[in-house]
């Protein structure tokens, strides 16, 4: 069995920037303590545990506004790479917290776009994953009733599309193929809609590389946290677009030999929030199973 290491894989620049903000804060003794991250800074528990070793506390939960009530007075609050709504920012200011913003620049771009189009009278159709913090933050830029979340092709066919200017926007970590299908349905219903496909370049490149590699292997392993949207989408695109069985693992201990019983070639990739040492351990485990490594894709 050969192992193909797909590139690019692992941390994107948005994740690197977010972790840099947090670690720099930990080193800066002038910053108020405690330092608290409002939600997981990125969706990977090993990245969160690393911050814990730097003395940074993570408060996690589905409602960022409620999490602020758990932050001690006088603390420093770090906003995660996924972004937050204006209501969260305002509440943090009201409570007097020292706020550090680790929002990914690509996510910030979408926030700005939502604000601009709402000010111009547009209704926003946002394609995203329900319950994920990125859509929650971006959609929070629009007043109630001015934004609609669409998460599936079926919903795209039936969702109410209000009259007047309409702008379609997307979460940055979706499957580019599924998103294209949803956009096609929406624009068929509303040819006048303005489309802004905000899937980030890092997500696109990782998905395209994984699909390309899938055509030449028997199994693809995606290393990523269960909560990582981009990792889960990598599994989906490999199976749906690449036509190859794919498995997501959090660590090397999740690997199952029976997945590779008839496999002669295996490819490994990782989500954009997966630490490289975790991916290396997965590759090392596979190599220990009688593997001859081939060059990177």
Q: For each predicted feature, which ranges?
A:
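The feature marks the mature, well-folded catalytic cores of soluble enzymes
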Residues: 1-297
């Amino acid at each position: 069995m050969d192992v193909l290491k797909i590139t690019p894989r692992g941390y994107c620049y948005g994740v690197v920037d977010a972790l840099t903000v947090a670690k720099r804060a930990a080193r800066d003794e002038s910053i108020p303590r405690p330092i608290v991250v409002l939600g997981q800074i990125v969706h990977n528990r090993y990245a969160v545990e690393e911050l814990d070793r730097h003395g940074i506390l993570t408060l996690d939960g589905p409602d960022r506004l409620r999490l602020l009530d758990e932050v001690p007075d006088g603390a420093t609050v770090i906003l995660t790479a996924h972004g937050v709504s204006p209501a969260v920012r305002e509440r943090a200011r009201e409570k007097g917290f020292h706020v550090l913003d680790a929002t990914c620049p690509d996510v910030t771009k979408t926030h700005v776009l939502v604000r601009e189009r709402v000010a111009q009278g547009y209704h926003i159709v946002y394609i995203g994953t329900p319950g994920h913090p990125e859509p929650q933050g971006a959609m929070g830029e629009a007043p109630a009733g001015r934004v609609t979340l669409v998460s599936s092709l079926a919903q795209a066919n039936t969702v109410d599309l209000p009259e007047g200017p309409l702008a379609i926007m997307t979460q940055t970590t979706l499957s580019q193929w599924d998103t294209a299908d949803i956009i096609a349905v929406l624009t068929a219903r509303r040819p006048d809609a303005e489309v802004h496909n905000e899937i980030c370049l890092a997500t696109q490149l990782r998905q395209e590389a994984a699909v390309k590699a899938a055509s030449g292997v028997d199994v693809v392993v995606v290393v990523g946290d269960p909560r990582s949207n981009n990792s889960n989408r990598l599994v989906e695109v490999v199976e749906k677009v690449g036509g190859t069985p794919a498995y997501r693992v959090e660590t090397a201990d999740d690997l199952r030999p029976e997945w590779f019983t008839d496999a002669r070639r295996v490819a490994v990739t990782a989500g954009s929030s997966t630490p490289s040492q975790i991916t290396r351990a997965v590759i090392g485990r596979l190599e220990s199973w009688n593997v001859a490594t081939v060059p990177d894709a």
